[in-house]
């Protein structure tokens, strides 16, 4: 309709997003999440994060997670956090798409794969 290579996809189902994604009060069972696609390729993914301790516990249980195993993560939420969000962008994906590079590893300065794991960093 708008003749654009970009499209936003929003309001993913709660079952398809991580526990920390905030639920959308206006759309039952959906989250305040989005992806930005460029010519069918996901470039950016983001969401408003859940900042309320009790809701995080509830969402962890909904996902089948044990909140006790996330105690360190949850500590800050006990004292209150402001509303916040986050996103991640795939710059290498965008570079590969703009330059018509078929393999993303060729658009990445230090590509990672199963054969390029630096064991010193994991010790």
Regions found by a protein language model. Name each.
Residues 1-123:
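A translation/RNA-centric and nucleic-acid-associated enzymatic feature enriched
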């Amino acid at each position: 309709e708008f003749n654009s290579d970009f499209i936003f996809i929003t309001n993913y189902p709660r079952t398809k997003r991580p526990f920390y994604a905030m639920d959308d009060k206006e759309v039952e069972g959906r989250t305040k999440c989005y992806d930005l696609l460029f010519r069918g390729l996901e470039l950016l993914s983001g969401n408003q994060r859940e900042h309320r301790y009790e809701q995080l516990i509830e969402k962890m249980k909904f996902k089948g997670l044990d909140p006790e195993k996330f105690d360190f993560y949850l500590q800050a939420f006990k004292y209150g956090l402001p509303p916040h969000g986050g996103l991640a962008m795939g710059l290498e994906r965008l570079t590969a798409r703009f330059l018509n590079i078929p393999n993303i590893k060729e658009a990445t300065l230090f590509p990672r794969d199963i054969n390029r794991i630096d064991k010193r960093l994991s010790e």
